[in-house]
Amino acid sequence: MSEEKQTAEQVEAAEQEEVTEQAEQAASQEQHEETAGQEEALQHQIDELQGLLDEKENKLLRVQADFENYKRRSRLEMEAAQKYRSQNVVTEILPALDNFERALQVEAESEQTKSLLQGMEMVRRQLMDALEKEGVEAIEAVGQEFDPNLHQAVMQVEDENFGSNIVIEELQKGYKLKDRVIRPSMVKVNQ
C-alpha cells in the first residue's frame, strides 16, 4: 500500500503541478491578452494623435501660405501705390497742358504775341519735363495702328492714302503714366 499511496501521492502531485501550470499559463495568457489590449489601445491613441498632428500641420501650412500671399499682395499694392502716386495730380494737370497746346497753335501776328507764345512754350516744356520725370509720356497715335487700349476712336473716315485701321488724326493727346494709360488719345481712324 505504501506504493499505492506513493503512486497516489505522485499522481496527486502531478495533478497539482498540472493545475498549477495551467493556472500559470492562464494567468500568463490573460496577462498577454491584457498587454495586447493595452498595446492596441495605445496604438489607437497614437493613431488619433498622429491624425490630429497631421491636421494641425496642414492648418499651419495653409495659414503660412495665406500669410505669405497676404504679404506679397500688400507689397505689390504698396509698389503700385508708390509707382502711380502722382496719377491724380497728373490727371488734373493734363487739361491745363491741353490749353497750353491749343494756345500755342495760334499764329503770332506781332512781335509781342510771338514773345508771349515763346514764354508759353517754355512753360509748357517745363511742365512736360516735370511730368516726364514722374514717368508720364505722350501716346503716339498718328500713323499708328488703332489700339483700343491706347486710343479712343471718335471718328471714322475713308482715306485711300492710309491703310485700314490706321490713326489719321489725333484730336486730343493721350498719356501714359509708366505702363498705365491715364488718358487714351482721341483719334480719327481710317476704315
Curated annotation (Swiss-Prot):
Gene Ontology molecular function, alphabetical: adenyl-nucleotide exchange factor activity; protein homodimerization activity; protein-folding chaperone binding; unfolded protein binding
Which stretches does UniProt call biased (Basic and acidic residues)?
30-49
User: What domain of life does the native source organism fall in?
Assistant: Bacteria
Q: Which CDD domains match?
A: GrpE
Listed GO biological process terms:
protein folding
Q: Which UniProt keywords apply?
A: Chaperone, Cytoplasm, Stress response
Q: Where in the cell is it found?
A: Cytoplasm
Q: Indicate, by first and last residue, each region the UniProt record lists as having compositional bias (Acidic residues).
A: 12-21
Q: Name one GO cellular component term.
A: cytoplasm
* One Pfam family recorded for the sequence: GrpE
Main location per the UniProt record = cytoplasm
UniProt-annotated stretches for the region Disordered = 1-49
Which HAMAP family does the record associate with it? GrpE (MF_01151)
Question: Could you give the subunit structure recorded for this chain?
Answer: Homodimer.
Q: Which family does it belong to?
A: Belongs to the GrpE family.
What is the stated purpose of this protein? Answer: Participates actively in the response to hyperosmotic and heat shock by preventing the aggregation of stress-denatured proteins, in association with DnaK and GrpE. It is the nucleotide exchange factor for DnaK and may function as a thermosensor. Unfolded proteins bind initially to DnaJ; upon interaction with the DnaJ-bound protein, DnaK hydrolyzes its bound ATP, resulting in the formation of a stable complex. GrpE releases ADP from DnaK; ATP binding to DnaK triggers the release of the substrate protein, thus completing the reaction cycle.
PANTHER family (alphabetical):
GRPE PROTEIN, GRPE PROTEIN HOMOLOG, MITOCHONDRIAL
Q: What is this protein called?
A: Protein GrpE
> What organism is this sequence from?
Bacillus velezensis (strain DSM 23117 / BGSC 10A6 / LMG 26770 / FZB42) (Bacillus amyloliquefaciens subsp. plantarum)
The gene name reads grpE
